[in-house]
């Protein structure tokens, strides 16, 4: 009898603990990663950039997809190669999942041309159908980095918009 009671109590506890509750995730908009709960859905600003194959890439290419974004430059001697290698591990891990993509923005578009990005992609064996290395106008890339991804922790409105952006973060979108 006691076993039946314990079974029923266990089943009741199990069922109650499986209750699905919907909670909104915070997004982070400050350098210290303090979450900001917002009632309005945050969106990555519209962009139109060029990938390592010379193709135009826009927000529409990522609509309905989960993607991981980052900011890098091809001549970076420090963290960028490590980030690229880690992103490559993720690309390989999700190579058969069409819902997951990758997007790497150069922060040195004056140097990282389409051909430079193409060579960089070959060096790291990047699958261009899944992972876009993008370049474009510096102002557009930096606007998207600051307003969309909050990637420039040191940027203040009174500071120069020409400040160099460099971050070691991946952004899950």
Positions of predicted regions on the chain:
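Short, acidic, Ser/Thr-enriched surface-loop or helix-capping motifs
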Residues: 51-52, 173
């Amino acid at each position: 009898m006691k076993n039946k009671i314990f079974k029923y109590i266990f089943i009741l506890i199990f069922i109650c603990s499986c209750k699905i509750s919907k909670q909104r995730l915070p997004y982070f908009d400050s350098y210290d990663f303090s979450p900001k709960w917002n009632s309005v859905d945050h969106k990555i600003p519209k962009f139109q950039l060029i990938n390592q194959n010379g193709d135009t890439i826009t927000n529409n290419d990522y609509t309905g997809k989960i993607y991981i974004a980052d900011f890098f430059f091809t001549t970076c001697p420090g963290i960028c190669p490590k980030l690229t290698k880690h992103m490559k591990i993720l690309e390989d891990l999700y190579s058969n999942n069409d819902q997951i993509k990758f997007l790497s923005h150069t922060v040195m578009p004056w140097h990282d041309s389409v051909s430079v990005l193409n060579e960089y992609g070959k060096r790291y064996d990047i699958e261009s159908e899944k992972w876009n290395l993008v370049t474009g106008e510096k102002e557009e890339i930096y606007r998207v980095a600051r307003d969309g991804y909050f990637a420039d922790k040191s940027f203040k409105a009174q500071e120069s918009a020409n400040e160099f952006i460099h971050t070691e973060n991946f952004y899950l979108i």
